[in-house]
């Protein structure tokens, strides 16, 4: 008989009366009046093994096994006695009467029980191998596998070719910091780990591969959050001879296919499309969570002439904004709730949080409760009530500051209230999945510190055709042929139509204050390739980690990656990064400089 004939979790009634050989780990061992029960676990689940004292040698071995011992058992599949069926297990109607028990490897006492749901992340990541044995982690990583498989199936059917691109490439520090790799044979020179395969996939389009994809690692040396890792996985795609709408349709269908085949979710038949400017105006975010049924009301123009300087000063500032957020039934929020929200928005740079409770709208000023009403004229109050559509029992929150502060603070407040218990109880958030496309992004952002424009996405994104003339006259007016797929407030994919003409790419570099010499040094290989009849092309990259995190309902992408880093970019399992031998440094022609100590 083979070492293993079945998986533990797949032993069911169809094997009744058969002898099976199983391998796995001891989940639990119970001694019930001379009969030992072992819950044996493998990747497919659990099966109950019964060890009778009739077989003395086997029983003696069973008495010595403990949790997480790796064992092999051979035995007879039989029905469980009446009244002992476990409906929660796939194998819950049967048990295996053990004939032979072999300990393949003993285990020291684990530092935690696998069913402990209150483990710290530090403990989990330090003992990641044991953490990965837990059913939830097994589920998450198998879900990740299925998502990757379904992406490949779809792309294969659509004529895409899986092509690997280099992991050691050229540093082009235009976005996040690169991870640098020193070259031993080229002293003083460095490779960079790719932040994305962007330029290589464009070169593949010039090389006539027409449709490319790969599921690949990317690397960015940036501060980490719950949805970021220094190394992450993209479903990276590029295609030739398709327009922006066709590209979006193609990959919208892919995401719809993946959700249906992996978690049986039917996404919208057609994803809504929203310009960037509308998303910022209504939600203060370029990745709005459409489940939350709250929107901003624009008040900037209405507050320019009020005497209340808190509103009028930002309303008249070039980069200022005044916006309101009406919360239906928010009048029942306590002063403690409001104070808590006030402290919350300070995290995002807001100086405070103005508010008005609408008790009796028909009474005008007298029907309102607020510390700011005394600073506003009746006409201004009427304008606020009319624009927000406020009703009795509502509360209106206000933000007035630089537009970025208003968008960040009021946008965060919108999500916090919407997803709160109050929001759920009052229908301010919907269940389910709310996808959309956000399009027409600004091509450039102005960097005040460097006094120049920088690429909002990357410098290879094509401007909209009607905005080409602005590249040399007014870059700030340029909109890009860029698009992000957003799902429940997460950007799960982003892409664009690329620049395929060398003269346009050179104009973009000039708009970014990248001179001809610098452009040739950094991107000469691309500029040269674009001169050889480069086709119109575009693409998109999806964050595999993010997609699986959402599907699994996980709190962090670290819960869907086998061996992730912490928020300090450390691997607690292997203790990476770590010092290296002086000899290795000499071979790489590197000398370490100690970081400067802060002055006392």
From Swiss-Prot:
Binding-site residues, ATP: 220-222, 229, 491, 543-546
Keyword annotations of the record: Aminoacyl-tRNA synthetase, ATP-binding, Cytoplasm, Ligase, Nucleotide-binding, Protein biosynthesis
Reaction it catalyzes: tRNA(Asx) + L-aspartate + ATP = L-aspartyl-tRNA(Asx) + AMP + diphosphate
Description of how the protein assembles with itself and partners: Homodimer.
Residues under site feature: Important for tRNA non-discrimination: 32, 83
Name of the protein this chain belongs to: Aspartate--tRNA(Asp/Asn) ligase
Binding site for L-aspartate: 174, 220, 457, 498
NCBIfam families: aspS_bact, PRK00476.1
Gene Ontology molecular-function annotations: aspartate-tRNA ligase activity; aspartate-tRNA(Asn) ligase activity; ATP binding; nucleic acid binding
Biological function: Aspartyl-tRNA synthetase with relaxed tRNA specificity since it is able to aspartylate not only its cognate tRNA(Asp) but also tRNA(Asn). Reaction proceeds in two steps: L-aspartate is first activated by ATP to form Asp-AMP and then transferred to the acceptor end of tRNA(Asp/Asn).
Family: Belongs to the class-II aminoacyl-tRNA synthetase family. Type 1 subfamily.
Span list, region Aspartate: 198-201
EC numbers for this chain: 6.1.1.23
UniProt xrefs under Pfam families: GAD, tRNA-synt_2, tRNA_anti-codon
